[in-house]
Amino acid sequence: LEHLLDSHIGELEPLALGGADVEEDLTRVGTAFLGAILSEESLAICRMVIAEMKRFPDLGQRFFDLGPMRAYAAFSGYLRHQQAAGTLDIADPDLTARQLLESLGGDLHMRAMLLNGPAPEPEDLERYVRNAVRIFLKGASSRPSSPT
């Protein structure tokens, strides 16, 4: 469990450095994150944790701390960096990071958990993430948005 989560959450580490293009940073790392949580291995672990939580109450907390909380922290750090740079105007980076990460997956994670259908194609994942990132940036940009 720890090894799997380390390998997936490690993909978020470059995000903390902060590139010049926020939209591309968030899209690139968000697509990698979504691909990771939708992998067969991740879905199997998540299903197992949910199934065994009653017998092993600490398992859910451990999974949450090693997975989602680390992802939220990585995104929050990035948002704080962009906020300090004046690129983003957000009141609560921690809350915003959680909301942004959850919006990236939309219904895809729930569908994958429950419907057991084919995984989305990589280009579909990127399109899904790019849309969520654009919506996020319209609300969080410190610059006036250009007319579209």
Task: Report the location of each language-model feature.
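Short alpha-helical
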Residues: 7, 44, 54, 58, ...
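Amphipathic alpha-helical segments used for helix-helix packing
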Residues: 37-65, 109-114
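Helix-loop "lid/cap" segments that line or gate small-molecule binding pockets
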Residues: 16, 31-38, 46-54, 135-139
